[in-house]
Amino acid sequence: MLRFDLLHTEGHARRGRLTLNHGVVETPIFMPVGTYGTVKGVMPASLEAMGAQIILGNTFHLWLRPGLDVLRQFGGLHRFENWQRPILTDSGGFQVWSLGAMRKISEEGVKFASPVNGDKLFLTPETSMQIQTVLNSDIVMQFDECTPYETSGHLTTEQEARASMELSLRWAARCKTEFARLENPNALFGIVQGGMFEPLRQASLDALVAMDFPGYAIGGVSVGEPKDEMLRIMAHTPHRLPAHKPRYLMGVGTPEDLVEGVTQGVDLFDCVMPTRNARNGHLFTRHGDLRLRNARYKTDERPIDESCTCTACNGFSRAYLHHLDRCGEMLGPMLTSIHNLHYFLNLMREVREALDAGRFEAFRAQFRADRARGV
């Protein structure tokens, strides 16, 4: 089940409401990433309390561990990880792509050695649909080949990008057929590919729209390309997708990227950045980024962000968090992860409120000014 209601627009920016089998998602929204069935260091109840409406799981990693027998026993991912709101699962295409020389791509699928135990595995569009059906994720992603920015040490050529994009389209058709055969009650999204070549992006988009997916994603960005190239594709693709269906920008990105994505018509975002950066002392605030490992914070009594209402900013000083990081105490990355996720989720809440009020452009200008001010 998927229903998308477009509530308001301002330029290309959209305010929407997405209804899925496990609940309603107000868009635009940021989706925390729970690769192995957990958003690292954060309890599900804490995620919900800070405003998370939908989270991610990873098909590839969950297939390897704990495996389908365990997930089938629990009736899917929701009960297994104690999260009763919507879940989106990636198809495994990006993870297979990231294996590099360890994998071999053919028309049929991808052969690779398991990074867990070295077993020889074969992942196909059909297998991906079967795994995601067991996971019972509300949004299922098609199995695709992530077109790299560089191929074998050189920039990916248009010919190489075309071959990759056309393979993903053939896989999309196979995913749609298998998804229907399985009678999966959830929603399958197609993924626009085409590298950094706008005509290929348009060709991919047109072919996927003709297949009539319930929603669409923009893939193959934030894969090593310069920021201006990513922004060019972000400006080209989202608003050309059907207005009455949700749009998802995969794996992006910084707070600035999210606001720019909303400007270009994106509804859904995900990225590991809030939690990964938190574990490395890189924190996001209203007034720019804070590098917690800097010695200047050793005696700083202020919270991470004085305007923030998260648990980490309610009674914990920068000095204390700096101390936890220096000592390798597990409470440190737990608190900083909560802060960064709260910041991203709150940013998107403010975006929605600005769109509701018809003042998104004014919000965007103030956001840029605040972030440029510095901590």
Swiss-Prot record:
- Fetch the SUPFAM superfamilies from UniProt: tRNA-guanine transglycosylase
Q: What species is this protein from?
A: Methylibium petroleiphilum (strain ATCC BAA-1232 / LMG 22953 / PM1)
Q: What does the UniProt keyword field contain?
A: Glycosyltransferase, Metal-binding, Queuosine biosynthesis, Transferase, tRNA processing, Zinc
Task: State its cofactor.
Answer: Zn(2+)
A GO BP term here is: queuosine biosynthetic process
Function noted in UniProt: Catalyzes the base-exchange of a guanine (G) residue with the queuine precursor 7-aminomethyl-7-deazaguanine (PreQ1) at position 34 (anticodon wobble position) in tRNAs with GU(N) anticodons (tRNA-Asp, -Asn, -His and -Tyr). Catalysis occurs through a double-displacement mechanism. The nucleophile active site attacks the C1' of nucleotide 34 to detach the guanine base from the RNA, forming a covalent enzyme-RNA intermediate. The proton acceptor active site deprotonates the incoming PreQ1, allowing a nucleophilic attack on the C1' of the ribose to form the product.
Protein name per the record: Queuine tRNA-ribosyltransferase
Where along this sequence does the record place binding of Zn(2+)?
C308, C310, C313, H339
Q: Which GO terms describe its cellular component?
A: cytosol
Write out the catalytic residues in the record. D90 (proton acceptor), D270 (nucleophile)
Q: In which pathway does it act?
A: tRNA modification; tRNA-queuosine biosynthesis
Q: Which Pfam families match?
A: TGT
Note the InterPro entries from the entry: ArchSynthase1/Queuine_TRR, TGT, TGT-like_sf, tRNA_ribo_trans-like
Catalyzed reactions per annotation: 7-aminomethyl-7-carbaguanine + guanosine(34) in tRNA = 7-aminomethyl-7-carbaguanosine(34) in tRNA + guanine
Q: Where does substrate bind?
A: D90, S91, G92, G93, F94, D144, Q193, G220
User: What is the similarity comment for this entry?
Assistant: Belongs to the queuine tRNA-ribosyltransferase family.
User: Per UniProt, what is the name of the gene that codes for the protein in this document?
Assistant: tgt
